Amino acid sequence: MTLDFWGTLLHDPPSSDNRYKKRRVADFETILAAAGVRARASALDRAYDESGAFLSRVWSQNRDVPVTEHVRAILTAVDPGLPQRVTGETMAMLIEAYARPALLVPPAVDESARGALAALAGRGYTLALVSNIMRSPGVTLRRLLERYGLLGYFRHTTFSDEVGVRKPDPEIFALTLRALGAEPEGAVHVGDDAVLDVQGAHAAGMRVIQVTSDARRPLGPWGPDGVIPRLAGLPDAIAGLDA
């Protein structure tokens, strides 16, 4: 069984995007100044938005890049020659600063997640995680899972920045199943997004349970195989699929 991260296990309001951006821009200004590079906050703010356009182009092809490339895109937007001028030490500090905002003000967790995962693990299900990232890398998201006591339930975790593929491309599901030695016909994916999770996992040959408050979601070939409002209902939903 595979699960999604954002909108399924953990939830972050849209306002977090701007908060994280402000934190990153402020940290970049401080780190670059200490390295002898003058970059105004206004220039970094603009560069951050330009890096978003770069990422959107990559993501629109269902592909992904490591967060090192996020940082490089920001520096390039400030000054095309800047990535070559910063030292390896400074680059490492920038990458760390870019990755950490979600750890400083962590997103909310579905409070029923731990109990649901424990119940499924107790029934012998092998659990894995399949998730796209936005700007917080997989290494940060694993630390959040660990903080909430969830990481240990997963035999394998797949994050798009680490494998170069994003949902809904079925390959990100396929490579996760290969890591588990599992076949798609016997696997179930759990996620919230109708395209990334439902269509993506179906294209990979898996069944899907969608986490959504819309109980009217149609089931069947074009919709999920089951619907739950929260992860508290997952053990029963899985039992229903297997019945």
Regions from the PLM with identified roles:
Residues 1, 5, 18, 30, ...:
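Asp-based, Mg2+/Mn2+-dependent phosphohydrolase catalytic module
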